[in-house]
């Protein structure tokens, strides 16, 4: 299933699905201390859903993560010790919840196959949201480095579908906060000073002709 949702409607979507159940869905977030994950965890706690966060032992002992972890605890989030690379810990965690939300980062996108395998073994997950939160990879023609990342996301989608796991893909398009600090420079950490990298051949158009699109939209009326 394809959906384009923001954080608020993300959990409204879960509420609508919950009408068929007697109580609120229990939600587990993987990667919840990362760039996007922390906002998903916060939204889950505020929504009233029992919210669980999979955390590694190393994360709990990381001083840099301590304030964030403490804020999660104060908001009622339940911490579950586990690891993406520990199959048994994933299965054990999944058996305690109804919904799994993955917010793993770029380097772990391909490793979501481990989540899929654990969901299949647990056998109780009602909905899986893989780490997406960008362009709809089945409808986007990208250049590198995005092309490789999109291909990995597409592979994960096909694996989810092949296993028959109930799912929703959340495609919310680009994040200005991710691209603007570096002026969209790949692997940059600050705005460019000496040169600018232009992806592709430099001739790609974001919008070919806005007027044409407007009249195509109103044509049926």
Give the positions of each predicted feature.
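An anion/phosphate-binding loop that grips the pyrophosphate of nucleotide cofactors and donors
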Residues: 97
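Oxidoreductase cofactor-interface core, primarily capturing Rossmann-like NAD(P)-dependent enzymes
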Residues: 2, 8, 22-75, 79, ...
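Receiver (REC) domain switch-region micro-motif
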Residues: 100
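The conserved beta1-alpha1 loop
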Residues: 103
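Cytosolic, low-complexity regulatory segments enriched in Ser/Pro/Gly with interspersed Lys/Arg
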Residues: 5-11, 15-19
């Amino acid at each position: 299933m394809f959906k384009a949702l923001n954080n608020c409607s993300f959990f409204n979507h879960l509420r609508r699905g919950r009408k068929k159940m007697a109580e609120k869905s229990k939600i587990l977030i993987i990667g919840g201390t990362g760039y996007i994950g922390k906002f998903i965890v916060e939204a889950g706690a505020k929504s009233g859903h029992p919210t669980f966060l999979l955390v590694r032992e190393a994360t709990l002992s990381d001083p840099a993560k301590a304030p964030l972890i403490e804020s999660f605890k104060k908001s009622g989030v339940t911490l579950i010790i586990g690891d993406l690379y520990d199959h048994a810990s994933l299965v054990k965690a999944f058996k305690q919840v109804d919904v799994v939300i993955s917010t793993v980062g770029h380097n772990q996108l391909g490793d979501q196959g481990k989540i899929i395998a654990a969901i299949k073994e647990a056998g109780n997950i009602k909905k899986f949201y893989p780490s997406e939160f960008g362009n709809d990879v089945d409808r986007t023609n990208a250049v590198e480095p995005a092309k490789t990342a999109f291909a990995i996301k597409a592979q994960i989608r096909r694996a989810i579908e092949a296993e028959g796991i109930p799912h929703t893909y959340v495609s919310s398009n680009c994040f200005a906060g991710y691209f603007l600090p570096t002026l969209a420079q790949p692997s940059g950490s600050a705005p460019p000073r000496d040169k600018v990298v232009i992806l592709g051949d430099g001739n790609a158009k974001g919008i070919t002709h806005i007027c044409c699109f407007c009249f195509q939209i109103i044509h049926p009326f």
